[in-house]
Amino acid sequence: MAKVPDLFEDLKNCYSENEDYSSEIDHLSLTQKSFYDASYDPLPEDCMDTFMSLSTSETSKTSKLNFKESVVLVAANGKTLKKRRLSLNQFITNDDLEAIANDPEEGIIRPRSVHYNFQSNTKYNFMRIVNHQCTLNDALNQSVIRDTSGQYLATAALNNLDDAVKFDMGAYTSEEDSQLPVTLRISKTRLFVSAQNEDEPVLLKEMPDTPKTIKDETNLLFFWERHGSKNYFKSVAHPKLFIATKQGKLVHMARGQPSITDFQILDNQF
């Protein structure tokens, strides 16, 4: 009868061969303790209360670390407070090192120096127009209008809503978001509302047509949130900011009060 191969013995031999290979390459003892169990010699006084980078072979003298190095926070008495492996093969900033000290959880650090847009590859696909030629009124019953320059939006108390800006709301969908992203286009034009930074007026951006897919132009997208008769438009590009109004100001982006962030949607809906 043929002998059944001993898989555990094969794995053991495989690990043994890998250990020998690793020893030749790294010149490290295979019996040494892991990074988390490692102990370190006392540090000189000028290294106390500072961030240091320790690799398996030498101490790094720069704050630019790669994934092969480890970060250690040392207290004034020389006691090691925190140790962590970095998993991203790229440079990180001093702010990232500061986060290690302030973060009570042990885990992977995502460098804050990486811009939001580079951390997400979300694509938003156009579905359909959900509101056609609608008017937006704020809590002061002021309607959204074009300002005199035509480049921005403002608000005014109107007797005739025909003078208010009419919007077409285009709904989008993505695999990652449970909310409803929409665009706000001025009806019968190619002008789309585009979010800006906090307290800056929204812009009217001209596009060739309604985008079928939005990936990089997320300033054009807003999460439409409805609470009863109140409607909120939260920026996809700046998730803490909402389309807002304020007496004497252009329509702008704000977190909340003293600006008004809720609107009523009037006119045709389908």
From Swiss-Prot:
This is Interleukin-1 alpha. Residues 82-86 are annotated as: Nuclear localization signal (NLS). Glycans are attached at N141. Belongs to the IL-1 family. It comes from the Eukaryota. It is found in: Nucleus; Cytoplasm; Secreted. CDD domains: beta-trefoil_IL1A. InterPro entries: IL-1_alpha, IL-1_CS, IL-1_fam, IL-1_propep, IL1/FGF. Keywords: Acetylation, Cytokine, Cytoplasm, Glycoprotein, Inflammatory response, Mitogen, Nucleus, Phosphoprotein, Pyrogen, Secreted. Monomer. Interacts with TMED10; the interaction mediates the translocation from the cytoplasm into the ERGIC (endoplasmic reticulum-Golgi intermediate compartment) and thereby secretion. Interacts with IL1R1. Interacts with S100A13; this interaction is the first step in the export of IL1A, followed by direct translocation of this complex across the plasma membrane. GO terms for molecular function: copper ion binding; cytokine activity; interleukin-1 receptor binding. Residues 1-112 form a propeptide. GO terms for cellular component: cytosol; extracellular space; nucleus. Cytokine constitutively present intracellularly in nearly all resting non-hematopoietic cells that plays an important role in inflammation and bridges the innate and adaptive immune systems. After binding to its receptor IL1R1 together with its accessory protein IL1RAP, forms the high affinity interleukin-1 receptor complex. Signaling involves the recruitment of adapter molecules such as MYD88, IRAK1 or IRAK4. In turn, mediates the activation of NF-kappa-B and the three MAPK pathways p38, p42/p44 and JNK pathways. It comes from Equus caballus. Its main location: nucleus. GO terms for biological process: cellular response to heat; cellular response to lipopolysaccharide; cytokine-mediated signaling pathway; fever generation; immune response; inflammatory response; positive regulation of canonical NF-kappaB signal transduction; positive regulation of cell division. Acetylated within its nuclear localization sequence, which impacts subcellular localization. Proteolytic processed by CAPN1 in a calcium-dependent manner. Cleavage from 31 kDa precursor to 18 kDa biologically active molecules. The lineage of its organism: Eukaryota, Metazoa, Chordata, Craniata, Vertebrata. The modification Phosphoserine is found at S87. SMART domains: IL1 (SM00125).
